[in-house]
């Protein structure tokens, strides 16, 4: 009998007292022995210097086990590795995994990657949302500035403020100039630009009766004239301060209302769009008439 022929276990002793139930079943049933497992071994394993180790391939010589990821404990018998962390694979292990053997670790990593939340995607979405909100606020500021410059007309002052400024026509231009600025341009420096207070002769030219009475008093005594002129100037300055206070209160009220509207960019944009469409409708109606 040849050496390569495999002999089933039930054919060793065809008869005798040592025959068991397994041998009896094997002789009666058409069973075949399982084929031997064949592994892919490293090439030229017989040429390696194995010292006293017999050149018989074992599981340590199988290529796909030695080259597997994170399996530093698996090594070829020809390698000399005293420690695991200092191990480097030999050039003979650069081989592909056997296609018949499934790579379970790779499938597990893919499943874990699918189960984990997409943190980079979430961070990107949050960054995009922040950038969009910043851009929306900038657009709202620009639109509000344009709308303020377009809507600040002479009608900005109400009837009360126009009545207050009516006895002083020389200051109407200054009040009208302050309304043409944007909200951010209205500062305390605008008060410096108010023209100088008119002198007493201007007041006399405005009211001739007052000039006659003052002329009589000046003829009486120069000291009384100085006192009266000082009292007139102080009363006029007090009147100007009161007018400035009225105008400042009016501006603060209008600014507070506009600032409340400026808090929400969406409200500003919708208001500007509403005005724009209203102007378009007015133009269309005028053209139609």
Swiss-Prot record:
InterPro entries tied to this protein: Mtfr1
PTM remark: Phosphorylated by AMPK. Upon stress, phosphorylation by AMPK is sufficient to induce mitochondrial fragmentation.
Modified residues (Phosphoserine): 38, 100, 107, 221-222, 235, 258, 270
Gene Ontology cellular component list: mitochondrial outer membrane; mitochondrion
Record's bilayer topology term: Peripheral membrane protein
Subcellular location as annotated: Mitochondrion outer membrane
Residues the record lists as Phosphothreonine modifications: 27
Disulfide pairings: none
Record's keyword terms, sorted: Membrane, Mitochondrion, Mitochondrion outer membrane, Phosphoprotein
Single biological process term from Gene Ontology: mitochondrial fission
Entry-linked Pfam families: Mito_fiss_reg
Phosphoprotein among keywords: yes
Free-text function comment from the UniProt entry: Mitochondrial protein required for adaptation of miochondrial dynamics to metabolic changes. Regulates mitochondrial morphology at steady state and mediates AMPK-dependent stress-induced mitochondrial fragmentation via the control of OPA1 levels.
Family (UniProt): Belongs to the MTFR1 family.
Protein's name according to its UniProt entry: Mitochondrial fission regulator 1-like
Source organism of this protein record: Rattus norvegicus (Rat)
Gene (UniProt): Mtfr1l
């Amino acid at each position: 009998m040849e050496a390569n022929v495999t002999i089933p276990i039930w054919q060793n002793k065809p008869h005798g007292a040592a025959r068991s139930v397994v041998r009896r079943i094997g002789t009666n049933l058409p069973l075949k022995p399982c084929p031997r497992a064949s592994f892919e071994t490293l090439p030229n394993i017989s040429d390696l210097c194995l010292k006293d180790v017999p050149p018989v391939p074992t599981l340590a010589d199988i290529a796909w086990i030695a080259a597997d990821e994170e399996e530093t404990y698996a090594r070829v018998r020809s390698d000399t590795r005293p420690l695991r962390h200092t191990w480097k694979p030999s050039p003979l292990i650069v081989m592909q995994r056997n296609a018949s053997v499934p790579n379970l670790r790779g499938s597990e990593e893919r499943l874990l990657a699918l189960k984990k939340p997409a943190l980079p995607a979430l961070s990107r979405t949050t960054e995009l949302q922040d950038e969009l909100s910043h851009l929306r606020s900038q657009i709202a500021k620009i639109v509000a500035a344009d709308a303020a410059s377009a809507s600040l007309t002479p009608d900005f002052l109400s009837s009360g403020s126009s009545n207050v400024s009516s006895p002083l026509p020389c200051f109407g231009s200054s009040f009208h100039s302050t309304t043409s600025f944007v909200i951010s341009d209205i500062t305390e420096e605008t008060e410096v630009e108010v023209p100088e207070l008119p002198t007493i002769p201007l007041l006399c030219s405005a009211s001739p009766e007052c000039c006659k009475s003052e002329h009589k008093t000046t003829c009486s005594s120069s000291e009384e004239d100085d006192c009266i002129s000082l009292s007139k100037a102080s009363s006029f300055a007090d009147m100007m301060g009161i007018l400035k206070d009225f105008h400042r209160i009016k501006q603060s009220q209008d600014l507070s209302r506009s600032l409340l509207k400026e808090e929400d960019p969406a409200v500003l944009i919708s208001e500007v769009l509403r005005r724009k469409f209203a102007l378009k409708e007015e133009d269309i109606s005028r053209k139609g008439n």
